[in-house]
Amino acid sequence: MLQNVTPHSKLPGEGNAGLLGLGPEAAAPGKRIRKPSLLYEGFESPTMASVPALQLTPANPPPPEVSNPKKPGRVTNQLQYLHKVVMKALWKHQFAWPFRQPVDAVKLGLPDYHKIIKQPMDMGTIKRRLENNYYWAASECMQDFNTMFTNCYIYNKPTDDIVLMAQTLEKIFLQKVASMPQEEQELVVTIPKNSHKKGAKLAALQGSITSAHQVPAVSSVSHTALYTPPPEIPTTVLNIPHPSVISSPLLKSLHSAGPQLLAVSAAPPAQPLAKKKGVKRKADTTTPTPTAILAPGSPASPPGSLEAKAARLPPMRRESGRPIKPPRKDLPDSQQQHQSSKKGKLSEQLKHCNGILKELLSKKHAAYAWPFYKPVDASALGLHDYHDIIKHPMDLSTVKRKMENRDYRDAQEFAADVRLMFSNCYKYNPPDHDVVAMARKLQDVFEFRYAKMPDEPLEPGPLPVSTALPPGLAKSSSESSSEESSSESSSEEDEEEDEEEEEEEEESESSDSEEERAHRLAELQEQLRAVHEQLAALSQGPISKPKRKREKKEKKKKRKAEKHRGRAGVDEDDKGSRAPRPSQPKKSKKASGSGGGSAATLGPPGFGPSGGSGTKLPKKATKTAPPALPTGYDSEEEEESRPMSYDEKRQLSLDINKLPGEKLGRVVHIIQAREPSLRDSNPEEIEIDFETLKPSTLRELERYVLSCLRKKPRKPYTIKKPVGKTKEELALEKKRELEKRLQDVSGQLNSTKKPPKKASEKTESSSTQQVAVSRLSASSSSSDSSSSSSSSSSSDTSDSDSG
């Protein structure tokens, strides 16, 4: 039907009908005369319709150039940072959408925009300039950013939303630029093989695409103009002779260019940008060849400059994902080889620390971690007093370098450096500063991950070593006699064992191979066996432990009954169970020194003189060894299940508060491991209610806290509880305890008041029965709450004590 319409037709109605697909007869008067008459006005004067369109088109000047063959560009470390870090952060921001493309004054109805703003700029243009290596220096790119923000502030009112959005983006821009490399260095870009051939093909392709995209810029809005380009567009696209080079998304985008060109676009440069993005994603997952096709940034770029720029872009993409490569290129080859050969295996805990470091440096936390990526440049930031206040600067890049060079021997050193970095920030900046809030946020991330630190495989080593010992040795060590020489020598042996275990932990963290670890384990096992043999030799003679245990359990069940039977029965009970008493303090010391690792085999420790419900929390108050710690429980089961008194819980709470920061993670781990209800709770917000914790959990915490606090000042903590108590005070305390005990006995057995006194005199008459007195005083410690005393019983007690 189109053949009926000629360009020189003088019958607009007939031409109109022809365009609608109607025959010439439809143009005659009839029922359908109204349809053609409606469109008649549009075709009455084609030139009149095209004039306003031609007047509107120049309202949007051509967008800024994104490539210039006459102006050389290059790739520098600063430009790469602006492209990969700054632009990426700004482009993804929720306020970035108005700045991603040039201002379309026609579409937005801003006729005076280009009269006021003489140099338009947008992030899309800057991004494409960076991709095309348009800039020679980073300052040119930063100037474009500043121009974009300034244009926004000049044209809009200060209260407009767009101004607030621009201010937010500018703040982020300045923050990112603050951590940009200080010295600008040109990066060497390697040119891949065959890039020139493909660059030439790209030039031909780009030329054809350019011609296709230039059509709508010249075309009119008139209907006749809309129908003239379509026959040319498919021929332009189909003339591309290299389908092997072009990826399928590009072909699809080119074929879809036809219908897109029919519509008048308000911003023509946006279309090539969208196509280029699609192919670039394809290129990222395949080979550098399609990337070379994508390199040119705009339709207006001449073919001559496309070869070099297409060849230079792919290496930049590869390097952008490896921020640690550029510094390494400055190192000599020998140094690089030395670094790689020097590295050994990381321990499990250091591997966990390395994972924490990677997370802190990840994009996930970049919004608040970026100030800590690199050392503080005091001169560049104008912080002239920084190094006067901060004596030991620290940053994440330094921590990473030390981790790569294996400078950290254990996780504590790593944590100390990270915490030093945060403390420097808190020390130098005011509390309400933005960087302090960022530091707190990042430290929360660090502490949360660090609290999940796994146990070192060899850290609980003493436990299997101890359980592998012959039963006789372990039993004899827990059942030795009460001689002073044996207790002194055993305490020395415990200190030696503590040192050995500390050395073992250090060695295990720095060990390089499984063979060395096994060898050290064997050596330490032999040393432990030798120590136990010495302890066995020092003891008077071991008694069989199974029988001992049964006796102790029976005594525990009959404790209350024996209490009612009188003092004599208690003395007999004490004589029967006094043999293992002196070695228990020693073993508790060892168990607490090793962090609770060997407590299960070597005897559980007792802590605190004030007892809860048990009667086996003795305080060693003999004149021969006053500084000895209260210790000792009859068996492991009793120790684990013995509830804590209020005073002990209070002391434990105070001790936990004294722990350094790096030790608190282990406290949380102990609680979560032993309390199923808290296993899934957040370590950052965990609340420790001592009333709800199991006794075994509290005892384990007590052992760990004591081991942590005792390792630093070894002896001050062992005499912590008796601090300030002289021998006289201890004697008075013992008198009060005996007095209370005698009151209980006299209240129940009035007729047998004298025998306890004689028994106590007998007990004090020999050195072997001194233990019974301490045993008795310890067993009476549970009745500290009663404070009444009588003068007669006090005199009896003083006689027995002086005896």
UniProtKB/Swiss-Prot annotation:
UniProt similarity note: Belongs to the BET family.
Gene Ontology biological process: chromatin looping; chromatin remodeling; neural tube closure; nucleosome assembly; positive regulation of T-helper 17 cell lineage commitment; protein localization to chromatin; regulation of DNA-templated transcription; regulation of transcription by RNA polymerase II
Modified residues (Phosphothreonine): T6
Residue ranges of the TM segments: none
Domain Bromo, chain residue ranges per copy: 74-180, 344-453
Modified-residue entries (N-acetylmethionine), positions: M1
Originating organism: Canis lupus familiaris (Dog)
Domain statement: The first bromo domain specifically recognizes histone H4 acetylated at 'Lys-12' (H4K12ac). It also specifically binds histone H4 acetyl-methylated at 'Lys-5' and 'Lys-12' (H4K5acme and H4K12acme, respectively). The second bromo domain recognizes and binds histone H4 acetylated at 'Lys-5' and 'Lys-12' (H4K5ac and H4K12ac, respectively).
Coiled-coil blocks: none
Database matches in PROSITE patterns: BROMODOMAIN_1, BROMODOMAIN_2, NET
Name of the protein described by the UniProt record: Bromodomain-containing protein 2
Keyword field: Acetylation, Bromodomain, Chromatin regulator, Chromosome, Nucleus, Phosphoprotein, Repeat, Transcription, Transcription regulation
InterPro entries: Bromo_Brdt_I, Bromo_Brdt_II, Bromo_chromatin_reader, Bromodomain, Bromodomain-like_sf, Bromodomain_CS, NET_dom, NET_sf
